[in-house]
Amino acid sequence: GSGKTEISKLIKKFISHKFGKTLIINGDDIRDIFDIKKYDREDRLKLGKKYTLLAKHITDQNINVIFAVAGLFDDLRKYNRKIINNYVEIFIKSDLARIVSHKKKPLYKKKNVGKIWGINLKPEFPKKPDITIENDFTIPLKRLANNLKKEIEKKFN
């Protein structure tokens, strides 16, 4: 809803050129591939740890991973930093009300009551992300992606 996947697609070529082979993994795609339907806190934590192990497995083969997921828990972010070399956390900050009003994702429909972070599940927003990009839906995603590229350049130069 915040633009994670689209921004990931827009920066992939830049990351590949600058840092080598790069793969985008979208959390929704992983859920679809493995038919994962549970969204409660416990299951999200378990899945998050699996995402981390998958990312580590790929990065250990010298392939960069852009993992487009909602990182909801401080414990998972700490785990990511501990397990993954060169881990960079990018927080796309968005207002939930705007996400819901702009998006037509099935997750935000009434049938999913009780499963939506920020509405029924309290997220733990990152306290110290490496990079923060604000998406208030007034700036085109292409420009946000360009801003992110500049921030990545600053971080690695």
Language model features: what each stretch is:
Residues 23-27, 61-70:
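Short beta-strand segments at enzyme active-site cores
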Residues 5:
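Walker A/P-loop
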Residues 2:
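ATP-binding Walker
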Residues 66-68, 83-102, 133:
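Conserved phosphate-donor/acceptor-positioning beta-strand/loop module used by diverse small-molecule
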Residues 93, 101-157:
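Small-molecule kinase domains that catalyze NTP-dependent phosphoryl transfer to phosphate-bearing small molecules
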